[in-house]
Amino acid sequence: MPDALVGLDVGTSGVKGVAIDADGRVLATATADYPLSRPQPGWSEQEPEDWWRAAEDCLARLPEGPVGFSGQMHGLVVLGADGSVLRPAILWNDQRTAVEAAEIEERVGLARLIELTGNRALTGFTAPKLLWLRRHEPGLYAQIRHILLPKDYVRYRLTGELAIDAADASGTVLFDVRRRVWSEEVCAALDIPLEWLPESHESTEIAGAGDQAAAALGVGIARPGPVSVVLGTSGVVFAALPAYTHDPQARLHVFCHAVPNTWHAMGVMLSAAGSAAWLRGVLGAGLAELDAEAEGWEPGTEGLLFAPYLAGERTPHPDPDARGAFTGLSARHDRGALWRAMLEGVAFGLRDSLELLRELGARPESGRISGGGARSELWLRIVASVLGLPLELTESEEGSAFGAALLAGVRAGVFADADDAVARCVRTRRRIEPEWDYDAGYARFRKLYPALSAVASP
């Protein structure tokens, strides 16, 4: 049995690595950062070589052992015939592909696309990026022979294998999510060669998953039960499903889970902790200071509301042009009020996703919360109250990397399956109960997007 199981998460800001033992105890961690490029408004790119160098750096500082991978979803890496990268990767938060997303829905048919893939063709997804390259960089497009997603490029550099897991492939809009295979029908409609696509496997076979599936596994969600709530740069509410189902309006994402024969639905808001980072910079203060000032305000901050659409939105409003706003400002409001309203606004956005998951049949009685935003004690209390769910924190705070390490253990035979890995390695350390009634505030929040959309569009 290996002494260590290693998980690597190829994130938007850097690679995070963790090594654990067979009981889930953290032996070592490592991080390595890299830059994000925004060459034009709405664009978001990174150099795949930066991911590889960061992964090498982390692996050099971790004990040796089987390696599992997680990473940012939807990003497009294009390789030529010799396996070299042809251009910077286009990331999940890139918004340049509105025309191509609409083209996909027209060519496949929106209802058919949702039936096959469980999702609409959103601007951040992978397939619209390919069509954008075909339209805007035809010379480069003609050189493409392989496509990969971010974490799978790192695996390729480490092993030479061109492969992907069903969980991450689900976010390409090229994957038949019910059947857990590439969709020949969608690829034919879009004129995308099937031979460009990496071979797909179950996450437990290849020790890899998209970041949200890996993060959910890392907090113990292998089967239906608690929801996973992630307060990362983006915000996620995630529920495991025992069978494939989908929202005909595709207001939620439905993907394959990292557990075989299990699916998940999730709502994604594009600016959760991202909203906090932005406002902290504007206000010029630290987290503890702002939380303390916000504690002086009652829930609802005397009518101040924040619309958390700083980077467009996905759930429940698939709108890349959505923009954020504060409404209800008065001369009484200070920076503590702004901070609390922002925390509440993000929590309201998470509740949008929870309500849709309930419509799809999820019946959670609690949640597991993770992500950088969970460092704010006040935010934990607000999110629990807005969602109306007790929230639990797990002992491990390593998120997707921890889930990737569990997958490495399953692949290596340390654990019998994902359920065994969760039972042996995931433990909760704290429970936060709801304490405030936010139903009236949420009802007001739901009116914000329709009211703002007309004036907020560029």
Positions of predicted regions on the chain:
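Glycine/Thr-rich phosphate-binding loops that ligate phosphate moieties of nucleotide
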Residues: 1-31, 68-107, 239-252, 256-458
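ATP-dependent carbohydrate kinase catalytic cores
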Residues: 167-265, 271-274, 288-293, 300, ...
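Short glycine/proline- and acidic residue-enriched helix-loop micro-motifs
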Residues: 110-120, 432-435
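Short beta-strand segments
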Residues: 9, 68-71, 148-151, 220, ...
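N-terminal phosphate-binding loop and adjacent alpha-helix
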Residues: 29-63
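Phosphate/pyrophosphate-binding loops at sites that engage ATP/ADP/AMP, CoA/4′-phosphopantetheine
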Residues: 55-66, 137-141, 184-194, 353-365
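Active-site nucleophile and cofactor-binding loops and adjacent substrate-binding regions
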Residues: 24, 46, 68-71, 90-93, ...
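Gly/Ser/Thr-rich active-site cleft segment
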Residues: 10-12, 114-212, 276, 311, ...
